[in-house]
Amino acid sequence: MVLDLDLFRVDKGGDPALIRETQEKRFKDPGLVDQLVKADSEWRRCRFRADNLNKLKNLCSKTIGEKMKKKEPVGDDEFIPEDVLNFDDLTADTLSALKVSQIKKVRLLIDEAIQKCDGERLKLEAERFENLREIGNLLHPSVPISNDEDADNKVERIWGDCTVRKKYSHVDLVVMVDGFEGEKGAVVAGSRGYFLKGVLVFLEQALIQYALRTLGSRGYTPIYTPFFMRKEVMQEVAQLSQFDEELYKVIGKGSEKSDDSSYDEKYLIATSEQPIAALHRDEWLRPEDLPIKYAGLSTCFRQEVGSHGRDTRGIFRVHQFEKIEQFVYSSPHDNKSWEMFEEMIGTAEEFYQSLGIPYHIVNIVSGSLNHAASKKLDLEAWFPGSGAFRELVSCSNCTDYQARRLRIRYGQTKKMMDKVEFVHMLNATMCATTRTICAILENYQTEKGIIVPEKLREFMPPGLQELIPFVKPAPIDQEPSKKQKKQHEGSKKKAKEVTLESQLQNMEVTEA
């Protein structure tokens, strides 16, 4: 995931000042741009010198061949005149004046200079890449410039009644329908572990089927992805911070051979976007085949580092969940990817409108975008039991930022193109099932249970097609109020004081 290096090169039509400005708008370090430009300039000089040295080496070999052909004496003099040691001014005429033994010595010295130059070039290349992968994509002009998403995310539109309030939150409702085992899940799987069971399993499967059917009718190809990826491929689709904050590492045997003692490092996927992005790695995609649209289905695994204390109860924010994802490879020309961007968020909106979930669409501020996104719109559903908007969908246009490192090129072959171009890649959540379940539970709660949204009824089993009944009391109704807790603690304290006073009185009587 990187920008085009030519964007940093003024002589190639690039504009480093624009990228520096983008970094500032993202509230990231603009100094990375200057460091990259410096490393790249030195790298280009180093490569130019290496090319010239290789030409000189070939010239030495050619000159030796010509002298041997003429049967000139080889000589045994390895002394090299000082002017010859200045390789920048070395010419064919200068070499012709030397003996074969001297030219061989010069060739060895050139070899040493090439090795030194190559070592320096590799070092500069690594330095350049370290800076390049931490510089974000160019921003779309409509992105709000701010580093405070709580205050400055721009609401683009609202659908449905986002003011209504209801009694219970999803934390209680998952228990009331007996569809969740949280404490036992935590014992088995650790923090945020859970068992989804009973009616909520059916509801989850109904959502998956409905989401896939909806996308299938819009030309998306359903695709069930691998759950883990090789490290070198994951590095091409995920930014560096994700390896520390989001991704789970899996260590396994290097091969299926019993005597193989090597180990292989893989990473569990955080979203099906990651393996689908790599599906056409190292390919040329023909213009007539675009757009290519996939409906990704996978289990997703996320560490949620940095979310300590947030949404610790229920199933809204968990380490493992099912998700259906929209993923599109688009043409980089004629604004096609931005038209597709609007189409994808529109598809998500139609899906949640059909489920009767109120929401608003927010344009995410520049400081909260990941490196790849040029623009991101979120669909945040209204949760009437919690009295808050919560994110259900993220839709991003990454333009050619992801495709460049994955080498997914646009067109036929390099021979057919004046310049190599890369496809644009877009992703959008269709349905993260556990979050959507939470939204349905809060919006469709009644005194007796949860009304099943009409669009999901055909996918539900008999007896659960219209209403999911409450079978357990709400945990919040069983918890003592703060006042009751205070009174109870006060009574215990008073009883303890009375007991202590009685003991002291008994001690006095005994002593007397």
UniProtKB/Swiss-Prot annotation:
Location of the region described as Interaction with tRNA in the Swiss-Prot/TrEMBL record: 9-61
CDD domains reported in the protein's UniProt record: SerRS_core (cd00770)
Domain of life of the native organism: Eukaryota
Binding site for L-serine: T271, R302, E325, N427, T429
UniProt keywords, alphabetically: Acetylation, Aminoacyl-tRNA synthetase, ATP-binding, Cytoplasm, DNA-binding, Ligase, Nucleotide-binding, Nucleus, Phosphoprotein, Protein biosynthesis
Site (Important for serine binding): T429
UniProt modified residues of type Phosphoserine: S241
GO biological-process terms attached to the record: cytoplasmic translation; negative regulation of angiogenesis; negative regulation of transcription by RNA polymerase II; negative regulation of vascular endothelial growth factor production; selenocysteine incorporation; seryl-tRNA aminoacylation
Annotated Basic and acidic residues bias: 479-499
Biased composition (Polar residues): 500-512
Residue positions, PTM N6-acetyllysine: K323
Main location: cytoplasm
N-acetylmethionine found at: M1
Pathway(s): Aminoacyl-tRNA biosynthesis; selenocysteinyl-tRNA(Sec) biosynthesis; L-seryl-tRNA(Sec) from L-serine and tRNA(Sec): step 1/1
Region (Disordered): 472-512
InterPro entries: aa-tRNA-synt_IIb, aa-tRNA-synth_II, aa-tRNA-synth_II/BPL/LPL, Ser-tRNA-ligase_type_1, Ser-tRNA-synth_1_N, SerRS_1_N_sf, SerRS_core, tRNA-bd_arm
Binding of ATP, residues: R302, Q303, E304, V318, H319, Q320, F321, E391, L392, V393, S394
GO cellular component terms, A-Z: cytoplasm; cytosol; nucleus
Enzyme nomenclature, EC number: 6.1.1.11
Subcellular location field: Cytoplasm; Nucleus
Lipid metabolism in keyword set: no
Family: Belongs to the class-II aminoacyl-tRNA synthetase family. Type-1 seryl-tRNA synthetase subfamily.
Assembly behavior: Homodimer. The tRNA molecule may bind across the dimer. Interacts with SIRT2. Interacts with METTL6; interaction is required for the tRNA N(3)-methylcytidine methyltransferase activity of METTL6.
Cited function: Catalyzes the attachment of serine to tRNA(Ser) in a two-step reaction: serine is first activated by ATP to form Ser-AMP and then transferred to the acceptor end of tRNA(Ser). Is probably also able to aminoacylate tRNA(Sec) with serine, to form the misacylated tRNA L-seryl-tRNA(Sec), which will be further converted into selenocysteinyl-tRNA(Sec). In the nucleus, binds to the VEGFA core promoter and prevents MYC binding and transcriptional activation by MYC. Recruits SIRT2 to the VEGFA promoter, promoting deacetylation of histone H4 at 'Lys-16' (H4K16).
Entry comment, domain topic: Consists of two distinct domains, a catalytic core and a N-terminal extension that is involved in tRNA binding.
Protein name, as recorded: Serine--tRNA ligase, cytoplasmic
Annotated organism of origin: Cricetulus griseus
